[in-house]
Amino acid sequence: MTSPKGPAIIIGYGPGVSRAVAEAFAREGYPLALIARNAAKLDAAVKELHAEDIAAAGFSADAGDAASLTLAIDAIRAAHGDAEVMLYNAALWRPGPVLDTTPESFDADFRVGVTGALVAARALAPAMIAAGRGTLLFTGGGLALYPSPQAPSLSVGKAGIRALALMLAQELAPRGVCVGTVTIAGEVAPGTPFAPEKIAQAFLAIHHGPADPATAEIVFTG
């Protein structure tokens, strides 16, 4: 289970979209480096992928803690070389009215949903720029376009991740690095137009497309 390609790093790995994207990149020959906070669940996920003959390794880290996330990315680089692909999928769902949201919880959610993405991009982009290739992907959401007062942190987080992705696309496209986000404008569920496998194909389309800010966002409507 070895590959000449650099790893595809999935940050915020779990069932659903991130697993479907991971498996899609594995089919293209990328070994997987998975980052998640829950070490026990991560170990189980890696074993499931190994059972499918997919090369994968797990690295436990908190995406909302810059030092923790940076250490995990450094460990991946040391063990598997520079990443060729990254998907940032970490986010927290904390429902409740806007005015019931505390500044502390809002800040914590933003660190996971957006600041961690910046930390990851800063850690991974230099090697991609040096190589003149690479892909940075971000899981977006319809709340970026249609914010809900019952999901204030996630609405702001998805607006932030969308803005970050589009700005990075403008900055990195001239250097050969492809950046994109899939804004998932619906509820993800198996066997529906919003099935994870269908969404994964949208991420692959960005990866295989040109490094162009004009095509950096796919609004996935099923």
Residues covered by each model-derived region:
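Conserved glycine-rich cofactor-binding loop
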Residues: 14-15
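Conserved glycine-rich Rossmann-like NAD(P)H-binding loop of the short-chain dehydrogenase/reductase
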Residues: 30-44
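Rossmann-fold cofactor-recognition segment
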Residues: 49-67
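Hydrophobic positions on the long internal alpha-helix
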Residues: 72, 87, 120-124
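Catalytic Tyr-X3-Lys loop
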Residues: 92, 99-118, 161
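Amphipathic alpha-helical dimer-interface segment in Rossmann-like NAD(P)H-dependent oxidoreductases
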Residues: 112-130
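Catalytic loop of short-chain dehydrogenase/reductase
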Residues: 129, 135-160, 166, 173, ...
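C-terminal helical subdomain
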Residues: 166, 174-222
